[in-house]
A protein has these predicted regions:
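Short, membrane-interfacial amphipathic segments enriched in basic
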Residues: 1-41, 218-219, 223
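Active-site cofactor/substrate anionic-group-binding motifs, chiefly glycine-
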Residues: 46-102, 106
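Selective transmembrane-helix segments that form parts of the transport pathway or gating/packing helices
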Residues: 51, 55, 59, 98, ...
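Hydrophobic positions within alpha-helical transmembrane segments of bacterial inner-membrane proteins
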Residues: 63, 67, 105, 109-110, ...
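Membrane-interfacial helix-loop-helix connectors in multipass membrane proteins
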Residues: 72-95, 160-205, 209, 213-235, ...
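A hydrophobic alpha-helix feature that marks transmembrane segments and, especially
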Residues: 105-123
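Short cytoplasmic-facing helical segments at TM-TM junctions of multi-pass membrane proteins
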Residues: 119-144, 226-229
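Helical hairpin unit composed of two closely spaced alpha helices linked by a short loop
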Residues: 233-251
Length: 254
């Protein structure tokens, strides 16, 4: 009983320490966000890495998700003679929920791991210490450009993913489910509201912030050795994915 209590207390203290480190890390990002110098080259490099190079995986995932969603909604709607709801539900479901969440998870798997591994390797090989020696703030040089790039790039990816997902539903709806092309498009557009699109883009910005902060945070606290880099990469992806799902719930409820 005493051992169990001690272990529980130790886990609680470790959790408090972790949360405290994360809060301090976020505060350091905020204090360096708008303070010169601005490393534009690192920023544009991060835009390409996070946005452009993530486009194929987000596009492919969204297309097949939209197609599968159309098939499932049609199968369910056919039981109640409500097949006509397929276009509108596919559009709303992709734009409000599935597009942002799946896009965020795909980017988290690709980008959070990449950021954590890159910064973790720099930490292990003492390149971060070299930046400090050269009077360069590591947060300013390594973290801030990636955070800003992710906050700007992920909503764009979400918007593109939404469009491709709706296109996937359209292709399946018109080729496999015998929907009329014009009617499918009209029903998809008519039931979408501006807030549906805006809420998905807001989620994308929040998810981008989560992905970049988690990747940078675990990379900066990486322990020595290859094992430490692997652990940092795993922790970044898992934490970012869990936080994305949690944030999605609260943003949907708000």
């Amino acid at each position: 009983m005493i051992r169990l209590t001690a272990r529980t207390g130790r886990l609680f203290l470790e959790l408090c320490s972790f949360v405290g480190e994360l809060i301090i890390f976020c505060f350091r990002i905020l204090t360096n966000l708008l303070v010169p110098p601005f490393f534009l080259r690192a920023f544009f490099s991060s835009i390409i890495q996070i946005g452009w190079l993530s486009l194929p995986v987000v596009g492919i995932t969204s297309f097949f998700t939209g197609g599968a969603l159309a098939l499932q909604i049609y199968a369910g709607g056919a039981r109640f003679n409500a097949e006509e709801v397929v276009p509108s539900i596919v559009a709303i479901g992709m734009v409000r929920e599935l597009g942002p969440v799946l896009g965020g998870l795909m980017v988290a798997a690709r980008v959070a791991s990449s950021i954590a591994a890159e910064i973790g390797t720099m930490k292990v090989t003492e390149q971060v210490d070299a930046l400090i020696t050269l009077s360069t703030e590591p947060i300013k040089y390594l973290v801030v450009p990636r955070v800003i790039a992710a906050v700007l790039a992920v909503p764009v990816l979400v918007g593109v993913g939404d469009s491709i997902g709706v296109l996937g539903g359209y292709v399946i709806g018109t080729t496999r489910l015998d929907f009329n092309n014009a009617i499918y498009l009209i029903n998809s557009i008519n039931y979408l509201e501006f807030w549906d699109v805006l809420s998905g883009l807001i989620k994308g910005a929040v998810f981008g912030c989560i992905i970049s902060v988690m990747g940078c945070f675990f990379g900066m606290r990486c322990e020595k050795g290859a094992r430490g880099v692997g652990q940092a990469t795993k922790s970044a992806v898992v934490s970012a994915s869990v936080l994305i799902l949690a944030a999605n719930y609260f943003l949907t409820e708000a």
